[in-house]
Amino acid sequence: MQLFLADCQFPDIENQVKAYQLFVEAWENGEIAKSDKTDKFEMLFRVHAPGEGRVVCLCRAHSDKEIFEHFAPWRAKFGIHMEFTPVISCQNVVDYHKDLFKTLK
């Protein structure tokens, strides 16, 4: 599965408040935990900067379909601007660069 960094920005304070009302409810009733880990998707971390109206997530997904399924409802309901970047782990950096360095000799 591929790692993705999601940078999410609320468009305004009104939508941020509405989204957090839903998030608090979903967190407390277990919906977030259920949707954060499936066979093809896993939320590894989610951090909040509410003063900036921003949430940053690191997730692992089988494909862009799982990214869409997880994040699209939040975007559709609250107009959250989302940017997704495929990223790699430290071990991947080491492995990939070892291969690269072999070709540069």
Language-model regions, residue ranges each:
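Short S/T/G/P-rich N-terminal loop/turn motif that feeds into the first structured element of a domain
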Residues: 1-53, 62-69, 88-105
